[in-house]
């Protein structure tokens, strides 16, 4: 059984609009890396949001590890905590994920929401700061950070949850060459360690480094009335 299964899902943002995803099916195995490609409007970000439980299809079924994920499933606080501990999501725009707390507090926020012990939270925060060489910025608020530092801080916050699955929306977008190389190496290491990666990216070198299975999405045609 695949870890992630989408069975003929259809999603639209409004009833009168053409669906962004129509009768779409997908399966992803544990430890696999899947790269989503396609033009703007093809549904890459929408698909990532469905996989992370931020959007829900109007038709079809999403199964994660054999359990159906829908609004009712995630309304249960215990199940929602388990799901979001297992599936981490990096937005394309890191500002969506960062508040005005210090970077240390930003990274600690997710583990704290999961109810982890204080000592465990401190260890995870320390390790994630070190992973991205962000220790000198630990007491700074995000508005003091560059765009590349914000992206790394947002990914650090995701990794602090220690998720099995990483859902990443354009993880290298807007980064300089040095930071792109650094994050490519990190994601390659995570992939080698058995993490499941699903990402939207236009970066050919990243796909090659991750040995990703590539899925090209295209926007559905409007239905005839």
Segments from the language model and where they lie:
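The feature captures the beta-strand-to-loop junction immediately N-terminal to the Walker
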Residues: 37-39
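Helix-to-loop junction immediately C-terminal to a conserved catalytic motif
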Residues: 52
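Conserved ABC transporter NBD signature motif
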Residues: 60-72, 83
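Conserved ABC ATPase "signature" region
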Residues: 119-137
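Conserved ABC ATPase signature
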Residues: 141-145, 149
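Catalytic Walker B motif of ABC-type/P-loop ATPase nucleotide-binding domains
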Residues: 166-170
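H-loop/switch region of ABC-family ATPase nucleotide-binding domains
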Residues: 201-202
